Structure formats: C-alpha cells, structure tokens
Amino acid sequence: MTASLWQQCLTRLQEELPSGEFGLWIRPLQAEFGDRSLTLYAANRFILDWVRDKYLLRINSLFTEICGADAPTLHFAVGRRPTAATVQMNTAAAPVADVRIGPAITVPSWTSKQDAMPEINHKSNINETYTFENFVEGKSNQLALAAAHQVAENPGGAYNPLFLYGGTGLGKTHLLHAVGNGIRARKPNAKVIYMQSERFVQDMVKALQNNAIQEFQRYYRSVDALLIDDIQFFAKKERSQEEFFHTFNALLEGNQQIILTSDRYPKEIDGVEDRLKSRFGWGLTIAIEPPELETRVAILMRKAEENKIHLPHEVAFFIAKRLRSNVRELEGALNRVIANARFTGKPINIDFVREALRDMLALQEKLVTIENIQKTVAEYYKIKVADLLSKRRSRSVARPRQLAMALAKELTNHSLPEIGDAFGGRDHTTVLHACRKIAELREESNDIKEDYSNLIRTLSS
C-alpha cells in the first residue's frame, strides 16, 4: 500500500467537493497505511464522526474504483500519527468567496507557560443562554457551526483566527457566546472575553486618558480567547486599529484564540487597514447566510418550545414563508404572537397570526414582488427583464431565469402557476424544474451558491 492511493482519492474529492467543504473536512485528515488497511486520523471526535457519516461511502467507492479487489479496509481514529506514517494533501484547494482556509495553530494557550505576573480580573460578558444546544442548524450556517464546535474543543488550535460574516440577525453573536461557553465548560478558569468592537475602542480611549495604556495592553493580551463582534466598526479609527493590530499579533503568537464577526467579507470592510484585513483571513473565514425555509420553521418551533407555547406546524410555516430576512426578525414576530395570545387568551392559528403580524406581513409583501425579483436578477447579470420573459434558451439567459423563478418561489407567496405566468406565460412544471435545478446547482456550484446568496441579501435588505 503506498501513499499514492490516498493522494489519488484526495485529488478526486477536491474535484468533487466545494472548496470550503474539502478544506474544512478532508484536507486536514492524516492517513496511515497498514497491511491491506488505511486509517484516517481526525483532530477530534467531532471531525471524525462528521467525516465518517458524510464521506465514508464515497471514500470506499474511490478505493474500489482505483484498486478493485485489492481495495484496503478503511478505519477511522482520533489523533495524529508519526510523520513517517502520515500523508496529507500538499496541494491547496482554491479559495472561494464564502470560505477561506489558512494556517492553523496547534497548541492551546493554557497548555504553555506564561511569564509570572499579578492575576488580572477578566470580565467575560459571555451570555450563558447562548449555547450550541439551542442553536438551530441549517444549510445556511452548517459550516460556521462546525468550525465553532472545533474552536470550542481546541481553542488556539483549530482555526485561528475564526472570522464569521453575514447580515444582521443571522446567529453570529449566538455562535460567539456558544464558543465562549464551550471553552469555559472544558476549562472553567479560562479567560474568555466577549465584546462589541466599540468597547475595545472605548477601553483604549480611557487607557490613553488615564496614561494606562500598558495596563490596557496587558489586559487584552493575557486572555485565552478574545471574541469581538462587529469588527467593521473599527473603520476609520486609526489609533484603535494600530492597537488592535499589535494585540492581534500578540495573541496569535501566544496561541490564544481570536474570533471576529462582521457584516461583510474582510476585504470588503472599508476604512480598515490592509494589513489588518489580511490578518483577518489568516485562519478560517466563513459566511453565514439567511436561513432557508426549513431552518426558519425549526427556529420558530424551538423558540415556541422554549416559551412552553404550542405552535402548530402550519402556523410556523405560515410565518417562516413570509418573514425571511433574519433570525432576529423571526423571533421578534413570534414574541409578538405569544404576547398577543397570552393577553387575549385566543388560540394561535393562522388567522390569529395574520392579525397579530399584519403590519410586518404587509411591509414584507410590499418589499418583495416578482417584478422586483426580475429587475434585481436582470441588473445582477447585466441582461434585460425582457430576456427573462422571452423564449431564449441560451445559458446566459436560461440560468438567470431559473434563478429568478427559484427566488420568486422562496421570497413570495405566489403559486407556481402564478410565477410561471409572470415569466412569459410558462407552465408551472417549468417553474418546478427551475427550482429543483437551482437547488441542485447550489449544492454543486460555488458560483451559483454565491449568486443566489447575494441576490437573497439584496432582495431581503
């Protein structure tokens, strides 16, 4: 058995999987070869279980395809193997817009000795109600959740820094607190600080005013994990950026975990120095997208359960179908429904919800129309709306038309026949085919996935 077998498998998997997925799960695996066997080693149990559940059948089929009857038996284990027995991929996956993979650091800060110094009292600000257990997973946040789990299990060693970006109310803050709670559950004395970026600025200003900048630096550079929300507010604050630049470097050199969030991709943050934006992408950068319909329903059902309220599934579906922009909006709507139900004593049904949320629903329906979707898609692809309505079948027109149909089904309450009629009198089966095709392409093509997400953000903002 030679290393070339696993290299061939890696090459095939890299071709088949999205770059971010390959880099997060497959590339870090290490292979040990035995007598007619191959053992794949994962860094921790979470990664091992994920890889075994998602990729076992495909890896075995590749072994059979390459080796035939001589295919090795595949085993999994947690840990690392000696260098001589280990093979990793030495070709890097191409970066994509929503996930970036960079170098990882392997030693948690609290396993290495620190210089002796007086104890500093760190106020964590971690919200104990935000945990991994009550975070609702969906396709839109799956990678971010997986990376957050790994960071909580191995702070300073899994992905450092971890940079999460996406629109308001999509769960970035929840994940920050969940990581903080996860770290402290494993290491109760860990110094974990959560903060908004504005607090870092305010603390620095106070330190300068009080001639206490060294104490400020010591405070922030002696943490085990620093979790900063909304890093985009550092924009145009040169002195704060300078201080954070040195804090960032000190933490990274000390193998101390950094997690940052923003409403946009690092390189798109205006007013932040290039050297900082470059460092933001050194570890792992992941986008969190607006939740899909099934996840929105699951969020509502979970929230209702937490409030000990019976929410009929059809009511959750009714709300989720109409409110699509973010989790915060969904939870706010449900809170209003619950408050109205408790005040009036009426049962929660669709008519009750329609009345309780009439202003929110009216606004949402006014904002997103099929006509608006058609104009937005046409502008995005630099074609004419008339092209979307025409009989033209060239890929440059057909694909945007399918995307627009899928968006109309996702973002409006129109039936398939109504959507088809709005696209040049097409049959409802054409719309159904378009929706299924786009769903497939979002799984297979990073370009289509990114286009769809960009259009959703534009139409929902």
UniProtKB/Swiss-Prot annotation:
Pfam families: Bac_DnaA, Bac_DnaA_C, DnaA_N. ATP binds at G169, G171, K172, T173. Residues 83-124 are annotated as: Domain II. It is found in: Cytoplasm. It comes from the Bacteria. CDD domains: AAA, Bac_DnaA_C. GO terms for biological process: DNA replication initiation; regulation of DNA replication. Signal peptide: none annotated. GO terms for molecular function: ATP binding; ATP hydrolysis activity; DNA replication origin binding; lipid binding. Its main location: cytoplasm. Residues 125-341 are annotated as: Domain III, AAA+ region. GO terms for cellular component: cytoplasm; plasma membrane. Residues 342-461 are annotated as: Domain IV, binds dsDNA. Plays an essential role in the initiation and regulation of chromosomal replication. ATP-DnaA binds to the origin of replication (oriC) to initiate formation of the DNA replication initiation complex once per cell cycle. Binds the DnaA box (a 9 base pair repeat at the origin) and separates the double-stranded (ds)DNA. Forms a right-handed helical filament on oriC DNA; dsDNA binds to the exterior of the filament while single-stranded (ss)DNA is stabiized in the filament's interior. NCBIfam families: DnaA. PANTHER family: CHROMOSOMAL REPLICATION INITIATOR PROTEIN DNAA. Domain I is involved in oligomerization and binding regulators, domain II is flexibile and of varying length in different bacteria, domain III forms the AAA+ region, while domain IV binds dsDNA. This is Chromosomal replication initiator protein DnaA. It comes from Tolumonas auensis (strain DSM 9187 / NBRC 110442 / TA 4).
